[in-house]
Design a protein with these regions (language model features):
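Short beta-edge strand/loop motif at the mouth of beta-sheet-based domains
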Residues: 12-13, 32-72, 152-157
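Hydrophobic pocket/interface hotspot
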Residues: 24, 34, 60-62, 79, ...
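Beta-strand/loop substructures that line and gate deep hydrophobic ligand-binding cavities in soluble
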Residues: 87-135
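Hydrophobic/aromatic beta-strand elements that line small-molecule binding cavities or substrate pockets
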Residues: 15, 49-52, 75-81, 98-105
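Short, hydrophobic/aromatic-rich segments at coil-to-beta transitions
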Residues: 55-61, 83-90
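Hydrophobic ligand-binding cavity/cleft-lining segments
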Residues: 1-44
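Intrinsic-disorder/low-complexity, polar/charged segments enriched in Ser/Thr/Lys/Arg/Asp/Glu/Gln
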Residues: 8-14, 21, 59, 74, ...
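Short amphipathic alpha-helical signal-transduction/dimerization elements
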Residues: 29, 137-148
Length: 157
């Protein structure tokens, strides 16, 4: 996994996941999956606080809750582009940050994911915020590994 500052208000994160592209895309567009990994370590995103309408103009809303003190962090975005299973683009209403997630089939059961954030607010560019974002990618990798293991078990039963 890597991340870089591509410009003064732009961040790029990349990660390779051991899961097929269709599954990785599905997990990013369905609340019952997002609830397992959305947000950094130490937060949760209850499924009842996640709304996903994956179509251009559709909403993407989440509420992350700090597990230690119960603080809530709502986010509302609108999808600009939805191209299954290749790309998701949304713009956050409050900050104006645009997020482009590109899913690349690397063959077999490997998927490359690039997350490009543009017009990134100052607080999101902090080292602490970037470290938190990386922990959410770690949580996503763990969730995908558990899903893939479950699917392999079911297919051999």
């Amino acid at each position: 996994m890597s991340n870089s500052a591509a410009g003064p208000a732009e961040l790029v994160f990349t990660r390779v996941f051991e899961a097929p592209r269709e599954l990785v895309f599905e997990c990013m567009t369905q609340p019952e999956h997002l609830t397992h990994f959305w947000g950094p370590a130490g937060t949760s995103a209850p499924v009842e606080h996640i709304t996903v309408d994956p179509r251009p103009g559709g909403v993407f809303e989440t509420v992350m809750i700090n597990d230690a003190d119960g603080s809530r962090y709502p986010t509302r975005a609108v999808y600009d582009e939805v191209a299954p299973p290749e790309r998701l683009v949304w713009t956050e209403a409050h900050s104006g940050m645009t997020v482009t997630v590109t899913f690349t089939d690397l063959g077999g059961t490997r998927t490359g994911v690039e997350i490009r954030q543009v017009n990134v607010p100052e607080f999101v560019r902090s080292p602490e915020a970037q470290a938190g974002f990386r922990t959410s990618l770690d949580r996503f990798a763990g969730y995908l590994a558990a899903l893939s293991a479950g699917r392999r078990t079911r297919s051999t039963s």
